[in-house]
Amino acid sequence: MCPRAARAPATLLLALGAVLWPAAGAWELTILHTNDVHSRLEQTSEDSSKCVNASRCMGGVARLFTKVQQIRRAEPNVLLLDAGDQYQGTIWFTVYKGAEVAHFMNALRYDAMALGNHEFDNGVEGLIEPLLKEAKFPILSANIKAKGPLASQISGLYLPYKVLPVGDEVVGIVGYTSKETPFLSNPGTNLVFEDEITALQPEVDKLKTLNVNKIIALGHSGFEMDKLIAQKVRGVDVVVGGHSNTFLYTGNPPSKEVPAGKYPFIVTSDDGRKVPVVQAYAFGKYLGYLKIEFDERGNVISSHGNPILLNSSIPEDPSIKADINKWRIKLDNYSTQELGKTIVYLDGSSQSCRFRECNMGNLICDAMINNNLRHTDEMFWNHVSMCILNGGGIRSPIDERNNGTITWENLAAVLPFGGTFDLVQLKGSTLKKAFEHSVHRYGQSTGEFLQVGGIHVVYDLSRKPGDRVVKLDVLCTKCRVPSYDPLKMDEVYKVILPNFLANGGDGFQMIKDELLRHDSGDQDINVVSTYISKMKVIYPAVEGRIKFSTGSHCHGSFSLIFLSLWAVIFVLYQ
């Protein structure tokens, strides 16, 4: 008998045992997590728009509750966490303004939540009254500091960290929120958003002095910051994040989302530890499921799991569903009022509108310009021809397969913020800066990527940030036949844009600082609904308003091919 063969089964059993059975003295924790749910209380279509075919719909709090309860019954040590941005995104938030978030998160018995930037969309009062005072779970952020009269008003309503008993152990949860929130939302002047890493370290140190040796950083700053926290903050064992809608998955993904990496994503900290980092995409489509094994000293021994797709194979809990239906009565007028029809898919997904021209962006910009038609001078066909719109302001697609019907509820999911479309005057040089800002960190799914109307722009992403706009043409107004001319740096142009951008949102500080005139306009949803009602049937296309130069597209692929070729040559000649 071959000795090597005899040893193989024993070796295999030992390896399997290491995976399937915890090490002696080890303690297991199951972390269930959501992020960026954005008011998707009801089940949605696969693209997170309004549910059309119930047999193919996903998510929703009733289905989430079913899965959470199944796991709680099967496993002993379970935490349910949310990494922020429950607020904003559908007619639910428009009507209930956050009360629905507190009610249904309480019903699901969340253990903790981190504050996201959108929790401040209705100001601090819109956070305090409906959510902070009503939540039966701790709401966390270590890097938000209140000052002035607000400090006493909000004291104790949110915390930097919380120690939670889980089985016979304790787990520390420390929260964080994007320091860019003042540029993304409306927190006011009495909240200071500190650097996440600088603010987190002393709070983690406090937890260590309390003999808490299992610490989760729960927050809303995006995947890049999540990874930095895992690397830089000493004592953090796990990072549960949000904000960037990052989809991580190990193996073949169950739906159309493309993984940005394996789940969990492992970061090696500066002190040599392996720190798992997770997110669960967005819109309640998935429930993050992470198993962590700790040793007696609180060190992570192993971590594994995957997001669970909440598809129709998971039944909706009847009691939660009944509660949803009861709350929904108040929304019915919004869902039955037909504005018009679309005969094409209106792509308002973040995967499109934050990366390239999307036809939803074209529709909205066309509506904005149409709303400003003023033929007052024979020299001008119109007083304004240009629109810019941050892709992050487009929050949902609309499916044409529901008879193409567009309702107020559909539009409220696309434009949930209740802003206005304003008219400003800018120099060409300011517009050029704005378009450079649009792609200065392209590829990170950030909201500043601009959708346009009356503008043709070409980017070269192989060039350094700040020098990526290679062509920028604008539609003339002083002309009888509109055509595109190169942007002139010293000329003053009229542009229609969201008031969010006029006020410097999404980092467009150059617009706020350099605008020459600012006139407030009509509410965004009214502008688009009026346009759709006027047109009756719409079919916006992708028209080449935004292009990327050949070098931009080929740059990364060419480098990869070049390196691969050299690798082959190296191997052949060894």
Curated annotation (Swiss-Prot):
Species classification: Eukaryota, Metazoa, Chordata, Craniata, Vertebrata
Glycosylation sites: 53, 311, 333, 403
Gene: NT5E
Record keywords, A-Z: Cell membrane, Disease variant, Disulfide bond, Glycoprotein, GPI-anchor, Hydrolase, Lipoprotein, Membrane, Metal-binding, Nucleotide-binding, Signal, Zinc
Superkingdom assignment: Eukaryota
Entry's disease: Calcification of joints and arteries: A condition characterized by adult-onset calcification of the lower extremity arteries, including the iliac, femoral and tibial arteries, and hand and foot capsule joints. Age of onset has been reported as early as the second decade of life, usually involving intense joint pain or calcification in the hands.
Protein name: 5'-nucleotidase
Cystine bridges: 51-57, 353-358, 365-387, 476-479
Topology relative to the membrane: Lipid-anchor; GPI-anchor
Uppermost EC category: hydrolase
Broad class of where this protein is predominantly found: membrane
Listed Gene3D superfamilies: 3.60.21.10, 5'-Nucleotidase, C-terminal domain
Residues involved in Zn(2+) 1 binding: 36, 38, 85
Protein EC: 3.1.3.35, 3.1.3.5, 3.1.3.89, 3.1.3.91
One term under GO cellular component: cell surface
Cleaved signal peptide residues: 1-26
